[in-house]
């Protein structure tokens, strides 16, 4: 059981009136299977997209939908990014992974978010570390598809065009089946142009640093050294919360 209390509520003062005699709570029965019509609408947008982009959050991991995500990316051949909580859902070694996005993310991941024409959000909540000021988010015209098991998370911060309420694993499985049965396929020429643009952003190499400067310890150097020391080992690495967590 998780009790989530907003910050403004926790700061308020009130008078204690004792415990209630009884507490009645309605059961939680989430919708697991996505609406077929909404999934078809989403596929129409994705297959017709010239600059598709997949944005995933911790919901993919919680739903054990990593395999389905990888299959979908294979079918669409589009770039994918994660939030902090979604890291690990898609292999970081895959060229289609652009790294984490948001205020602590990569140049290519954030630019792709701002320039895509169809965005598929999967198990993510568009938090402020990702979108910043909602007024300045989605400046370019684009369609947003949002898959989430919690209906209250959809269109909460960013208005979406195709909401799909359901379990991420079930919805992605249904989506994959529909793509395989469909006659339409992504526009490969448009995708090639999109990837050319993405690779231009990636070429900036936003995480690079001056290796010749040994006067200060760079976070990148620390992470690289830690990687070399633990590569191939069955190692567990933990991190405190803060800027160093973002580097880790």
Per-region residue spans from a language model:
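Conformationally flexible catalytic loops at phosphate/diphosphate-handling active centers
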Residues: 1-45, 206
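Short internal beta-strands
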Residues: 4, 77-84, 145-148
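Glycine-rich phosphate/diphosphate-binding loops that line cofactor/substrate pockets in enzymes
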Residues: 38-53, 72, 113-115, 225-235
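Glycine-rich, acidic loop regions that bind phosphate or pyrophosphate groups
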Residues: 86-197
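Glycine-rich beta-alpha junction loops
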Residues: 5-11, 58-60, 151, 241-243
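Glycine-rich phosphate/diphosphate-binding loop of Rossmann-like nucleotide-binding domains
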Residues: 53, 61-74
